[in-house]
């Protein structure tokens, strides 16, 4: 925020595969560039940029979450949710820009968050794609009774929504834990508090979709996702749960990557 206005309409109007790419690959690349600029090009001014990034973080997550709260279209809801996720990632960049020996914690948070977000968001959009192919709609009404029409899709979508919320035993929790932890470690308590409040708001609209899938009357015919989508969904689900249940391996990878990035920046 406030440069997100194009995103919801673009995601909503684009074919779901294109929206998936825009919400994951482009965002990951953008944050890689931003981190590179702040760690190398703006090193002498990093302290001055901290209030700006912190303010953008709060504004971005708040505007994204409260806009998502009003949506009845799941695809559009995830578009605004993607805006809010960018705000959480900015929290990690705030900790990185303090650039002390513990700055690695903020960079770890950014990398972990992006890694978890990649599988979680791709998986969520794949479920939307499968539902849209059968029903022709991405409105929340198309997801009503999904547990009866396609139990596997419903369960995997719950995993992705819980990960986006930041519930333990998911990759999203690992990313949020490191990002929020970095903010607290650098004594940005107010920033972490804003993040927690926003996470609570996000939980409401994510769980609203879960309620529609599990606790509303079944409508429409059974859903059968194409085999390609099924395989991709299984990969995303396993990766999301693996990062939450057995995080040690990915943490080692991220520690190594963070150390190398900071060594180059210094």
Label for each model-derived stretch:
Residues 1-266:
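Alpha-helical transmembrane segments of multi-pass membrane proteins predominantly involved
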């Amino acid at each position: 925020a406030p440069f997100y206005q194009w995103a919801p309409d673009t995601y909503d109007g684009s074919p779901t595969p294109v929206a998936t790419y825009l919400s994951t690959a482009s965002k990951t690349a953008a944050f890689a560039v931003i981190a590179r600029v702040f760690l190398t090009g703006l090193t002498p001014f990093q302290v001055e940029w901290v209030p700006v990034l912190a303010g953008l973080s709060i504004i971005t997550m708040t505007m994204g979450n409260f806009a998502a709260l009003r949506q009845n279209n799941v695809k559009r809801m995830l578009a605004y949710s993607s805006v809010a996720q960018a705000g959480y990632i900015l929290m990690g960049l705030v900790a990185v820009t303090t650039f002390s020996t513990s700055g690695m914690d903020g960079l770890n948070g950014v990398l972990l968050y992006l890694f978890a977000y990649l599988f979680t968001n791709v998986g969520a959009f794949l479920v939307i794609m499968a539902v849209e192919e059968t029903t022709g709609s991405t409105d929340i009404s198309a997801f009503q009774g999904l547990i009866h029409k396609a139990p596997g899709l419903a369960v995997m979508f719950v995993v992705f929504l819980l990960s986006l919320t930041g519930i333990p035993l998911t990759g999203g929790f690992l990313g949020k834990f490191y990002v929020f932890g970095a903010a607290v470690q650098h004594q940005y308590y107010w920033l972490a508090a804003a993040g927690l409040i926003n996470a609570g708001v996000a939980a409401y609209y994510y769980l609203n979709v879960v309620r529609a899938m599990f606790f509303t009357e079944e409508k429409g015919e059974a859903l059968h996702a194409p085999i390609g989508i099924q395989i991709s969904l299984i990969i995303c689900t396993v990766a999301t749960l693996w990062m939450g249940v057995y995080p040690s391996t990915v943490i080692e990878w991220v520690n190594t990557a963070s150390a190398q990035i900071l060594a180059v920046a210094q």
